[in-house]
Structure formats: structure tokens, C-alpha cells
Amino acid sequence: MARIHPLFTFTFPCAILRSTFMRREIVLDIETRNTFQDVGAYNPSLLKISLIGVYFYETDTFETFLEEDLPKLWPRLEKSDRIIGYNLLGFDYPCMQTYYTGDLMSLPTLDVMIEIEKRIGHRVKLDDVAKATLGVGKSGHGLMAVEYWKNGEIDKLRDYCLQDVRVTRDVYEHALKNGFVRYTDRQGVAQDVPMPIELPEPDQRTAINLSLGL
């Protein structure tokens, strides 16, 4: 079942940025049950989701959704003003799309990794961005999440995923507040990346409802 995680609270002064209106932005990250090696191809659509971790600005809560809970998540994504993630377009969305009856690419999305790539010409790992920008990194490498799933350590899996969600959110908030993020280059030097991001206009429309009411 979907679970709310009240112990995860703001570690970044976001409340001021939320004051103009109740933000309906969402930050998410997915974990999978298997690896590219398991499926024999670098194809995210072949992977099976174990869990999706989500931060909801509207309620200031972190929640996790197991595979069987995903129908409860889709309407909330459709009602959001913006979905934020790191490598959403290249990994999370292709994997999620096999579970979703609508078109995830039609939803308002900000992929922080792509925004950085546009400015510096190459991709950077979230861990390198988080450590340089926030002084805090990810909780580990992706294979750990697969092992947690295989070992039935669901609570560890939830914590692992939500740490990535929290780090992604805080990198995004840093860009909102300061207009830049940092990453560590191949020489180990921290580099600034200009990233002027504005809050989305609050969307007054009814939910897109591409998931057929599920």
C-alpha cells in the first residue's frame, strides 16, 4: 500500500518559495526490481518498478508507492503543475509508461539533469550535483535498491528512494532560490551552472485524466 513518511521534513528553506500560492509540484524518483543486465538491454521500458518515491509540495509530505499502488498515483501526477526529477525523461518516464494508460510526456515536466546538460554539453550524475551544491549526496548506487527489493527489505528501499527524492528536491530549490547549481567536474573542481528556473503558474484546469479515472 502507499505510505506517507512524516519523518521526512524540509531540510531546505522552501516555505518562503511556497508562500505565493499552494504549489502543486511533485518530485519523484523510481526504483526497479531488476537491472539492464537482467533484461539484456539498455531499455528502461523492460524494467519492472519496485517502488516510486514522491514528494508533494501541496501537502509537504513524502510518500512511497509500490507497484500495486500506482493507480493511486496517476491522478495526482495529472493534477500537478509540474513533475520534477533527475533523468526523468531518459529513465523514470520510459519505465513508468508501461504501467500508465496515458502519455507521461504530455505532463508538465522539469528534468533537472537535462537542464544541466543543456548548459554544459554533457550529463552529470545526481550525486556529483548534490555534493557540490548541497554538501549532501545520494544514499548509494542503484544496485543497492535492487538488492533491497530482492531481500525483502522494503523499509530500507523506501528510505533509499526517498533520500534521492529529497536530494533532487533540494537541488531544485537551490536553483529556484539562487539561479544556479554546482557540479564536480572530472578534475574534482566544483563548477557553477546557471539555472534560472521560475515557479510554474498555478494551473486552474481540471486534471488531464489520461489514466481513465484509475
Describe the predicted segments one by one.
Residues 2-214:
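DEDD superfamily 3′-5′ metal-dependent exonuclease/proofreading module
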